[in-house]
Structures are given as structure tokens and as C-alpha cells.
Amino acid sequence: MSKVTVVGAGNVGATCANVLAFNEVADEVVMLDVKEGVSEGKAMDMMQTAQLLGFDTTVVGCTNDYAQTANSDVVVITSGIPRKPGMTREELIGVNAGIVKSVAENILKYSPNAILVVISNPMDTMTYLSLKALGLPKNRIIGMGGALDSSRFKYFLSQALGCNANEVEGMVIGGHGDTTMIPLTRFATYKGMPVTNFISEEKLNEVAAATMVGGATLTKLLGTSAWYAPGAAGAFVVESILHDQKKMIPCSVYLEGEYGESDICIGVPVILGKNGIEKIVELDLNADEKAKFAASAKAVHGTNAALKEVGAL
């Protein structure tokens, strides 16, 4: 029997759990939250759609009862607070690092063999913290960011091409942030051909720019962070792992020399299967792409340095 736990029953966590249930990715999905009644209520609400939508997955909610998460195959961590007005980056990292570290440690008490998928922000840094604090093999800790950024890239590509998003291929690597992500326009294809056969270089650059501010655009429209695509991206990553699909998905993973970087978690394409990260795929980047990746990694290293400043590592 397969089991997935989603920690954090906010918008992103609940959406992730809902997609996992609707697509019957696991036999059981457990939602855990610190706020009493929230995960229980959302789980009950989801289960009341089972007959309407025709799924058999069981969704259970609990308040801080990690025993209910026991023997999970995959655990998705969405816990943390959003950045508040006047809050420094270091303050946000200090708070979220404490939350994520505590959650991960509690999860491993009951599911020592679980694969962790990190969504909490700043995502690359929280993935790095989880790996360093827990001492798990690097194949078992995965940051979701690149899956979401690539999905947004494909959305904007499809809008420019006037086609379905499933007809295009596109990938975003680098840090999960609007100044650090790198939409790989050179690798983007439509019906197996370079998208530049169909749209101008100028239009393609506009697509890349829209992708980079995709999250900020939604925050401006919604007044809060997006949740449908982030939650679905988390579920997409979980499905490739749990069903051993061996999909190539850009995710934040620990590098040891790949792409010329070490001691960092950052977005690169990986093959995801039953062991988590089955393989890191090294693309043949050109000089411009390499320079952008190095700059992105430098920025992520800078954010990671704050972990030591706040005593999280």
C-alpha cells in the first residue's frame, strides 16, 4: 500500500493533496498541519468529492500527530510562513529553517526511508538545509521548484504559439527565484522542432521574461502566492517517484561537480523514479547559459550563507 504525507494544509499543501487523491497517485494521503482542525476539515471535504470524481484514494487529516504519517513512501513539505512586510530575508530564513528542520526530523522518526519533496521557500535553501541537517543520501531530498517554473514556461510558450501546453517542451534550470531562474529558450520545442521556427527570437525572449516573473505576476493579481500550479507541480514530482515513471523533470538537487557547481541545491534536469533522484542529466550548455547558471548559483550560495548567520546550520 502506497502512502504520501503532505505537511502543511495551506493552499499549496491542500492542492497537492487534492491532485494526488484525484489522480490516485497513492492509496493513502495524509495531510498534517499545526492549526487544529484545518487538515481534518480539508481532508473530509476532499473525501466528499470521491464519489463525484471517481477516485479511491483515502485522504486523512491530522493536527501535529506525526504517528499518523508513519511508513510514508514520499513526504511533501510545504510548511513555512510567507515573507511579511518589513521582514528581512534573514528573518524569513531563520523562521522557515526552524520549521522545515523540525518537520523533517519528526517525519523521519516515523518514516526513516521516506523520500522528501521540499516546496517551502526559499526552496533551494530549504532543500539544502534538509539535506545538510538530516544527513540523508542526496537522492532522497528533492526541491520542487524547476517543475513549477518549467510548467509556467510551457504555458507562456503555448500562449505565444497559440497551441496546447502539452504540445510544447521547455525547461527552466537554476535557482527558484525571479532573478535566478534560467528558461532554456534554445532547448524549447514545438512538435519536435525549435520554437524559433514558429515565433521570433524577440517573442521567445518575451516568453522567458514572463516566465521569470510568473510567480510575482500571480501574487500581484491574487494578493497572495499562487497555489494551483505549485501544488500540482509537487504532485507531479511525487507521481514520477512513486510510480517509478523515470520522467526527466528539473528539480533542485545537491550537486557535487555537475554543471561546475558543488555544495549547493539548485535546479537541474533529473530522472525521477522509485529511488528519488535516479540520475542528474548534464545538458550541453553554451557559454551564455553557463554564465547565467554560474550567476544563479552564486545568488543561491548567498542565500544559503544566511543559514549559518541565523544558526540553522
UniProtKB/Swiss-Prot annotation:
Function text: Catalyzes the reversible oxidation of malate to oxaloacetate.
GO BP: carboxylic acid metabolic process; tricarboxylic acid cycle
SUPFAM superfamilies: LDH C-terminal domain-like, NAD(P)-binding Rossmann-fold domains
Binding site for substrate: R83, R89, N121, R152
Catalytic residues (positions): H176
One GO term describing the cellular component: cytoplasm
Catalysis performed (reactions): (S)-malate + NAD(+) = oxaloacetate + NADH + H(+)
Family listed: Belongs to the LDH/MDH superfamily. MDH type 3 family.
Keywords of the record: NAD, Oxidoreductase, Tricarboxylic acid cycle
EC number: 1.1.1.37
Organism: Bacteroides thetaiotaomicron (strain ATCC 29148 / DSM 2079 / JCM 5827 / CCUG 10774 / NCTC 10582 / VPI-5482 / E50)
UniProt keyword Lipoprotein, yes or no: no
UniProt keyword NAD, yes or no: yes
Annotated InterPro entries: L-lactate/malate_DH (IPR001557), Lactate/malate_DH_C (IPR022383), Lactate/malate_DH_N (IPR001236), Lactate_DH/Glyco_Ohase_4_C (IPR015955), Malate_DH_type3 (IPR011275), NAD(P)-bd_dom_sf (IPR036291)
UniProt binding sites for NAD(+): G8, A9, G10, N11, V12, G13, D33, N96, I119, S120, N121
Coiled-coil residues: none
GO-annotated molecular function: L-malate dehydrogenase (NAD+) activity
Pfam families per record: Ldh_1_C, Ldh_1_N
Residue ranges of the TM segments: none
Major enzyme class: oxidoreductase
Name recorded for this polypeptide: Malate dehydrogenase
